[in-house]
Amino acid sequence: MKSLTLEQIIKLHDDIINKTSGSYGIRDNKMLKALVYCPFQTVFNKECYKTDLEKICKLSFELVKQHPFIDGNKRIGAHILLVLSKVNNLTFQYSQKELSDLFLKLASSEYNYNNLLNWIRGRVMNVK
């Protein structure tokens, strides 16, 4: 799977804040670093998140829930979902309202990781 570095994620976050307003900065640098590697963790030499889609959803979800940035955590979570899907040749159909509603539900804990994964699986057109 093609992934993003910590520096790339921070740059994307800064770009989002530039375009949409809000506060710059990282609230918890150690947490952010951990989140970047979270989708690739193993237990007893077995991947916790086996598919590209599971890894992408895990990073996106944790960016929203763990709130590593001062502002824009839902926005960067959604953007990472879209960017990583694109660079890994995954396409899915959605409306902007559906995506916005999804990330609001994630942030409010109305939805969890499995809800996000199932939402994407229901809309994905090609899965690795």
Positions of PLM-derived features:
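FIC/Doc superfamily catalytic core
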Residues: 1-128
